[in-house]
Amino acid sequence: MSFIKEFREFAMRGNVVDMAVGVIIGGAFGKIVSSLVGDVVMPVLGILTGGVDFKDMKMVLAEAVGETPAVTLNYGMFIQNVFDFIIIAFAIFLMIKAINKLKKPAEEAPKGPSQEELLAEIRDLLKK
């Protein structure tokens, strides 16, 4: 089998295509959630906390000197990214929960004979 043909079969396998679609949709979903958090949730949260803009929250570690910019710890952006993560994780949890609910439960394998029944059968065979 040629290398190209083998790669084509691999790339067109259902799992790879499904994963590619998931990555693309996940990227788009991430942008939507980032916009939701940055443009809707954080401004409302800022108003509730007295007009704080979380994007501007930072701790200056070293002041700017001449042409060198200040060294800052931007914890406001970190808080915003934590909100992004929580919303995305919760949405994924809900989707997986819904998918698992839709999946049909796997049929149980038929139960075989018990250990006692097998031992009795072996005993009977040895008696013959």
From Swiss-Prot:
Spans through the membrane: 10-30, 76-96
Gene3D superfamilies: Large-conductance mechanosensitive channel, MscL, domain 1
Keyword presence, Iron: no
SUPFAM superfamilies assigned to the protein according to its UniProt record, in alphabetical order: Gated mechanosensitive channel
Major location category of this protein: membrane
Any Pfam family hit: MscL
Topology relative to the membrane: Multi-pass membrane protein
Localization per Swiss-Prot or TrEMBL: Cell inner membrane
GO molecular function, one term: mechanosensitive monoatomic ion channel activity
The entry's keywords: Cell inner membrane, Cell membrane, Ion channel, Ion transport, Membrane, Transmembrane, Transmembrane helix, Transport
GO cellular component: a single term: plasma membrane
Functional summary from the UniProt entry: Channel that opens in response to stretch forces in the membrane lipid bilayer. May participate in the regulation of osmotic pressure changes within the cell.
Protein family per UniProt: Belongs to the MscL family.
HAMAP family the UniProt entry points to: MscL
Subunit structure, interactors included: Homopentamer.
PANTHER family: LARGE-CONDUCTANCE MECHANOSENSITIVE CHANNEL, MECHANOSENSITIVE CHANNEL MSCL
Protein name: Large-conductance mechanosensitive channel
Organism: Actinobacillus succinogenes (strain ATCC 55618 / DSM 22257 / CCUG 43843 / 130Z)
UniProt lineage: Bacteria, Pseudomonadati, Pseudomonadota, Gammaproteobacteria, Pasteurellales
Gene: mscL
